């Protein structure tokens, strides 16, 4: 399946034909006889997708060790994560179990990536109808880490969960946010920082959901000529750093584009939930191997003449 992902095979027949064209090498891959289309179909349906999930998680841990020292261009040593999701459309006729509209089917891939890399650290696959913010209830937040979220995750109760775990968040504020300022911090107009305020949500329900102080930063992005309003809970870091942290969120968008552009997660070799999840997790192992192999060679210690 990894071979099929990386070489864009069109189906199980195409996969079997290509593998059998190199029959002399199949033994080393664990095949004792030519590969049949039915063998691939049976494996796709019967082998639990969690096997590939565990393999991908092991590769995630390995990949992160190689990229841990990457410079994000911020004066921060904290780990910075970005959270987002992407919807993968499916045929309602072939995948009726994934229906989410009257005429459409699809699944949603909720993803958390370490922006150093970027390397995925957590992936959850759900029906496309599930709202993004519900995924936050499943996560264990790392104390001291930053979590970069778009407006779809702006829920004060969930944001309070991040803060109570000792972690930090940076998110876009919704247009209808009502915020009561308690004090203002210095601005930096040349850098784009228009305002920097500390306060609390105005509405009683929102204030009860997030009782601690919040920080609201208004930033003008000269590249897009847009005013952006951020909410965050660290009160000490520079306001410009808050904006730069959020700007790094584009890396998760690039991650999704790379996955959809280079791996097969739109065309599936099976139609069951197990087959779809198997293919997605094997696609993740392919991405992680591509991330690991180049940097692993730079970490090799070559033997000295005496050792040779």
Write out the residue ranges for each language-model feature.
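Small-residue-rich helix-loop
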Residues: 275-284
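Short, catalytically relevant binding-site loops at active-site mouths
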Residues: 176-177, 235-237, 263-266, 275-276
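Amphipathic alpha-helical core segments of compact helical bundles
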Residues: 286-290, 294
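Conserved, well-structured functional cores that handle cations and Mg-NTP chemistry
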Residues: 1-245
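Short amphipathic alpha-helical "interface-anchor" segments enriched in bulky aromatics
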Residues: 242-270
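Short coil/turn segments at secondary-structure boundaries
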Residues: 14, 71-74, 257-262, 272
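Conserved small/polar residues in nucleotide/adenosyl-binding loops
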Residues: 298-304
